[in-house]
Amino acid sequence: GDGRVVEGHDPVTGAVRWSYSRDTDLCGVSWVYRFAVAVFSDDRGCGQASTLDGSTGQRGPARSSYSDRRVELSSDGTTVLSAGDTRLELWRSDMVRMLSYGEIDARVKPSSKGLHTGCRLASAAASSSAVSVLEACGRQADLRLTLLRPAKEEDEPDQHNVAEPGIGADSGAKILAVSETRTAVYLPAPQPRVDVIDETGTTVGSTLLPEPPLTTNVVTRSSNLITWWTGHRVMVFDTANLTYRYAIGPAGSSAPVGPATLLAGKLMVPVTDGIAVCDPVNGVGEDFLPVHRAPGDVPVIPLATGAQLLEQRGKTLVALGPG
């Protein structure tokens, strides 16, 4: 999607199968099950969401609500998280809101936060049953981690706050992934690391990093694996419990240039001059596929659809194949 238009392409030929446009700007595109989820702006922010069948472009469920002027969309395949600087929402595939948190323009309940009264949401991620967010609140110097779970009322989620002493609002700390009961979070101090925190706020695992990640770092979810490209290497975690498995780093003049995806039972890792084909169990390289890419500084994000391997390079989607 770009501008005011969302297009569906044939994954093999690249031909446009369908397009959908609105008379307002597109804020972002995500996905859930077989649907693309397109979010457009209106006078209440980026809150106009439409689902579109990925094969035909036929419209499905839609929703509208208050939102920030800029949002980041993410999905675990069954739910969609829309997160801005002051508000987030978790949507089911039918676009019913499961959970909302943060500021709202029209307060209905005393517990609701009016505009300019809440915290800045520095980073957020979700699973189908939980949301975790790093917040910068008031004059507090440190971020806090807030663990959210859907409750009887979608705008009154269960909350558990975890202090993160020494982690400033602009430190680069980031929620990497959320499972049913755990959260993986990158924390830069006192030493760069990934902590895994359970629903009680207890740290149940910690992995040190040899260097801080780049600001362009990217997380992807593929089947039973979560991969995080730090800008230097790809770190791999289990989806279910977020246990750290292994890392794939530079080898000679070749280094990872993006996160990984699974295709035909193999872990496909974009590297400087091609694709490293690795064993998903231990990360050991098994094969190499040369790929010519124009020089660039954007992450290369691989995607698998059926037997087709795609790469997202900035705003360009490239289908890889023989030839």
Q: What label would you give each PLM region?
A:
Residues 1-2, 30-44, 50, 76-90, ...:
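Short beta-strand elements that form the blades of beta-propeller/WD-repeat-like
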Residues 1-26, 50-66, 95-108, 155-166, ...:
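Aromatic (tryptophan-biased) beta-strands that constitute blades/sheets of beta-rich domains
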Residues 8, 13-143:
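Long, acidic/polar, low-complexity amphipathic helices and coiled-coil-like
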Residues 9-10, 50-53, 90-93, 146-150, ...:
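Hydrophobic/aromatic beta-strand positions that recur at structurally equivalent sites within the blades
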Residues 22-35, 64-78, 108-124, 163-180, ...:
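Repeated scaffold domains used in trafficking and secretory/extracellular systems
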Residues 102-239:
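Acidic, serine/threonine- and glycine-rich low-complexity intrinsically disordered segments
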Residues 208-217, 221-292:
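Intrinsically disordered, low-complexity segments enriched in Gly and acidic/Ser/Thr residues
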Residues 283, 291-294, 306, 311-323:
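N-terminal export/targeting signals for secretion/compartment entry
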